[in-house]
Regions:
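Acidic/glycine-enriched connector segments
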Residues: 1-166
Length: 167
């Protein structure tokens, strides 16, 4: 029996209007929107979640799913890591956060050993190919998030769009 699953796409921290400042009110509101959406998706029968584990919105999503899992132990979280050592060049604090979150995931799928051009899109396609619904934090600009949404549309995957606040 197929277990309905949900994945996520969103911008990296450096592309967010508030950057790495997670105390910014816009960031706090987005994190709440992500949690509320994850909770609603869970209530609709989606208990498996896939996360790409990139800096920024992906980690917000991961944290929201793990928070949901505290109250709902049937939640399953898979980390879809594009390449081994994804966080090796991140700032120490973000790398520690990443590693702590990775340890709490039920499954970690590493798609390839080393970085290569296109490995992020390969990861994004893997997630869409294994999901029935996509939550997207998107600001309207070109990039990996838009490409992932376009791929999801081609695959006939439902998209729940969470717009980003500019200012």
């Amino acid at each position: 029996m197929h277990e309905p699953s949900c994945t996520f796409t969103g911008h990296r921290a450096e592309k967010l209007p508030w950057g790495f400042d997670e105390n910014d009110a816009r960031c706090r509101r987005l994190k709440q929107k992500i949690y509320d959406t994850v909770d609603a998706v869970y209530d609709a029968g989606f208990h498996k979640f896939l996360c790409g584990m990139a800096e920024g919105c992906d980690l917000y999503f991961c944290e929201a799913v793990l928070l949901l899992k505290e109250a709902n132990p049937d939640v399953v979280l898979e980390a879809a890591v594009p390449f081994a050592g994804q966080a090796a060049r991140w700032p120490e604090r973000e790398r520690q956060r990443y590693e702590a979150l990775l340890r709490r995931c039920d499954t970690v799928t590493v798609l390839q050993e080393e970085y290569s051009a296109g490995c992020m899109m390969k990861r994004n396609r893997y997630m869409v190919d294994h999901a029935d619904i996509l939550i997207a934090c998107y600001d309207g600009k070109p990039g990996g998030t838009l490409n992932t949404m376009r791929y999801a549309i081609k695959q006939d995957i439902q998209i729940l769009h969470l717009p980003l606040e500019d200012a």
